[in-house]
């Protein structure tokens, strides 16, 4: 069974942040979360995250997850020293018989398919993930013999002129037999320009011990890009968003402009979905067949039924929208909003913890909170469900086929019967009976000949 070690102890000084570097987000989740997802896709027996700077915050973010443990590296003396801190946990049980894969918490986008290719290249030996770069400055170089076999890795600061001319570089990611890895880590030294214990030094030891060292390459160059600064974080964000957009396009989604699309979670789309510019999708979002999302909308943890249109500048969070519905523009669906098929929610309407039944409409300037609204109900402009008494929330019930006039306040708890009509301007404090007109306002009167006051000189 596979062990995975994730190195996440670095300070991230260039990030200029109090937040541990691996907790900075990419596409809506911490970088470490991306690495953990890829690692879990391999179904390892254990994952050990090596923490250091900000250890308490990193552990708190992922504590309690099955198969995940932490090892502390303090102080930090290099990547080899970091892996040494995980060795005791790797050797527990039958761990010594396993292989260990080493990943990095600030290299967030290495894909499971690439890691499987690396595992396949290993055989019974060691495999390193390498890449050929036009400018290899700053990277460790892969040194091969005349037969093309990997013999060692030399860090840039320790490389001579001939070695610096090599374009194949080490990404840092490798897999090795656990028992041998433990032995090699005890034999490395810090006799180098940095005065650190390099994990890469195990390659020369493996070769000296007659262990085959193989190499594999990622499918895309962005998979092995690390993040050490805000600029690199922003660059990698755009590269990953471009990849996510490409995947949506290949799945049949129409994106008005792939460069202005942001997916910060999972986005599942049916057939013939159209997404306009500037939209943001967070958490888990599911769009049914034929859904159209207008420009600059935000959808977070939302399910949208087939044929529904979300108009411009609408914000939906933890909500469900049925088939053939209309939402927006400038609508807000808050947590617990549940719209039935063919429901309409128009501009400047806010719905929270409420059901709007099939073919019901709230087209203008309304607040509907803690309400159960039946089918074919018309909610007039300016309607408010007064659901909060200062301490507790109360529900409003509006039955099928009711008509709620404009500028109406429903003071919960209150019920509007089936087919009832509330006259415009009504403040409802008691239940309104079915099939009746209910109104509460003073009788209109006129004062003939009344004059407005005149400003005194």
Curated annotation (Swiss-Prot):
Subcellular location: Cytoplasm
Renumbered residue ranges of the record's region Pyrophosphorylase: 1-230
Ligand binding (UDP-N-acetyl-alpha-D-glucosamine): 7-10, 21, 73, 78-79, 104-106, 140, 155, 170, 228, 334, 352, 367, 378
Cofactor remark: Binds 1 Mg(2+) ion per subunit.
Reaction it catalyzes: alpha-D-glucosamine 1-phosphate + acetyl-CoA = N-acetyl-alpha-D-glucosamine 1-phosphate + CoA + H(+); N-acetyl-alpha-D-glucosamine 1-phosphate + UTP + H(+) = UDP-N-acetyl-alpha-D-glucosamine + diphosphate
Pfam family, one: Hexapep
Gene3D superfamilies per UniProt: Hexapeptide repeat proteins, Spore Coat Polysaccharide Biosynthesis Protein SpsA, Chain A
Cofactor(s) it depends on: Mg(2+)
Region (N-acetyltransferase): 252-457
GO biological process: cell morphogenesis; cell wall organization; lipid A biosynthetic process; peptidoglycan biosynthetic process; regulation of cell shape; UDP-N-acetylglucosamine biosynthetic process
Chain sites annotated for binding acetyl-CoA: 381, 387-388, 406, 424, 441
Major enzyme class: transferase
Tree of life domain: Bacteria
Annotated stretches, region: Linker: 231-251
Matching InterPro entries: Bifunctional_GlmU (IPR005882), GlmU-like (IPR050065), GlmU_C_LbH (IPR038009), Hexapep (IPR001451), Hexapep_transf_CS (IPR018357), MobA-like_NTP_Trfase (IPR025877), Nucleotide-diphossugar_trans (IPR029044), Trimer_LpxA-like_sf (IPR011004)
Active-site residues from the entry: 364
Statement: the UniProt record of this protein carries the keyword Iron: no
A GO cellular component annotation in the UniProt record: membrane
Cross-referenced PROSITE patterns: HEXAPEP_TRANSFERASES (PS00101)
Keyword field: Acyltransferase, Cell shape, Cell wall biogenesis/degradation, Cytoplasm, Magnesium, Metal-binding, Multifunctional enzyme, Nucleotidyltransferase, Peptidoglycan synthesis, Repeat, Transferase
Disulfide bonds: none
Record function comment: Catalyzes the last two sequential reactions in the de novo biosynthetic pathway for UDP-N-acetylglucosamine (UDP-GlcNAc). The C-terminal domain catalyzes the transfer of acetyl group from acetyl coenzyme A to glucosamine-1-phosphate (GlcN-1-P) to produce N-acetylglucosamine-1-phosphate (GlcNAc-1-P), which is converted into UDP-GlcNAc by the transfer of uridine 5-monophosphate (from uridine 5-triphosphate), a reaction catalyzed by the N-terminal domain.
PANTHER family named in the record: BIFUNCTIONAL PROTEIN GLMU (PTHR43584:SF3), NUCLEOTIDYL TRANSFERASE (PTHR43584)
Family, similarity comment: In the N-terminal section; belongs to the N-acetylglucosamine-1-phosphate uridyltransferase family.
Subunit description: Homotrimer.
Protein name: Bifunctional protein GlmU
Taxonomic lineage from the root: Bacteria, Pseudomonadati, Pseudomonadota, Betaproteobacteria, Burkholderiales
